[in-house]
Amino acid sequence: MTNKSNKILNTNITKLVNQPYKYGFSTVIEKDIIEKGLNEDVICLISKKKNEPKFLLEFRLKAFKKWKEMKCPDWAQIKFSEIDYQDIIYYSAPKVKKKLNSLDEVDPELLKTFEKLGISLTEQKRLANVAIDAVFDSVSIATTFKEELAECGVIFSSISEAIQEYPELIEKYLGSVVPIGDNYFSALNSAVFTDGSFCYIPKDTICPLELSTYFRINDQKSGQFERTLIVAEKNSQVSYLEGCTAPQYDSNQLHAAVVELVALENADIKYSTVQNWYAGNNYGEGGIYNFVTKRGLCAGSNSKISWTQVETGSNITWKYPSCLLVGDKAKGEFYSVALTNNYQQADTGSKMIHVGKNTRSRIVSKGISAGNSKNTYRGLVNISNKAIGARNYSQCDSLLIGNLSNANTFPFISVQNPTAKIEHEASTSKIGEEQIFYFLQRGIPIEKGVELMISGFCQEVFTELPLEFAAEADRLLTLKLEGSVG
């Protein structure tokens, strides 16, 4: 190809990746906030506002003490300005009645916001097969299908509500998978979390609906610190979906969440995420700092936890969904697509810790880097000396778009049992002139050609997503890449 055609090609492909962020609007609403700053008084005030039992306040204060003794981790392949934790609002909520009895009492502006995001909470329009918990800044504003789920014993509510109604379950499981001192950001979350979702699936129950939580950050100065806790009892199954967006601001906002999953004997938890926080502008200004701890405990024999994620947003992503395979014949899975563009930075991956006998794990990671972005996969497979017959398969593939993006892979494998079997493979490829020229020769436009290549590259992960998310994820990747191949 000539230099002129190369220029045209690069210009066309660059147009393909940069599409305006359509969720960047904000909602003007009357708010109840705790002034910015972080100390014991703020933590006590959060607990008081939520009328929490004594054990939870003690949990928070213990976590805060631990956090003050810790340092922000600096080993990841990401660079960002130092976060001023005293310049963050830790509680921001729409002003509402203390107890909402129906959606009629929810501020119409909030309902309109979620409608614009494609999340309908009203009875006439809500999805028939998905129960949704909608979280706006620091609080849950509505949960659908609670009564229908309760009929088969399934508890699905905001974690704030669960603390009031099922304190014994919260006290038993909160912090049981991610201890308060696990890492810097989980300790912060344990001290200041304000809401999130709680799911409890009783013994011998298959949850009849997909459970879903949609997180929306709205306030420019606030962070979001939600907590999700899912417990699946013996012989139960549940599928949980998670989505998120945020307004388009020039400044950065902090999102530090914790997710804990507990699967008992023969239980199956499938956890899917489409992460679409605001990523910042084309020059790397603004966007969400996304520091998340996700971990599942396969406590019972034959239990299974599967993580599937599509990461397209955030200025910075630091996230490693993991499985502790304690029960014999337990199984852990991780399927991921991480897309970075412009000046985004992602350091993400998974940990599979094998403890029980004949445990199995599978990791499939797909990284796509465009623009000036940096995309890093970081994985740990640990086989303990008790994990007789453990098996792991890991696959890490990177796709580079353009000449300025960066992809790294850091696998770490530790084996203490000679009966274990580990397989690891990795590849790096690039969308270049030859591939594009191949499509053009056959009358296929650049946009369609790139879309087909990316869709094929990610197919192994997309097939693991629930039907409701799979088509949306494919479409989202295409939109995110509008304008960036070059």
Swiss-Prot record:
Compartments where found: Plastid, Chloroplast
KW Coiled coil (keyword) present: no
Any one GO BP annotation for this protein: iron-sulfur cluster assembly
Keyword Oxidoreductase: no
GO cellular component: chloroplast
A Pfam family reported for this protein in Swiss-Prot or TrEMBL: SufBD_N
Signal peptide (residue range): none
Entry-linked InterPro entries: Fe-S_cluster_assembly_SufBD, SUF_FeS_clus_asmbl_SufB, SUF_FeS_clus_asmbl_SufBD_core, SUF_FeS_clus_asmbl_SufBD_sf, SufBD_N
Keywords: Chloroplast, Plastid
Alphabetical list of NCBIfam families matching this protein: PRK11814.1 (NF008773), sufB (TIGR01980)
Family, as annotated: Belongs to the iron-sulfur cluster assembly SufBD family.
Name of the protein: Iron-sulfur cluster assembly SufBD family protein ycf24
Taxonomic source organism: Trieres chinensis
Organism placement in taxonomy: Eukaryota, Sar, Stramenopiles, Ochrophyta, Bacillariophyta
Gene that specifies this protein: ycf24
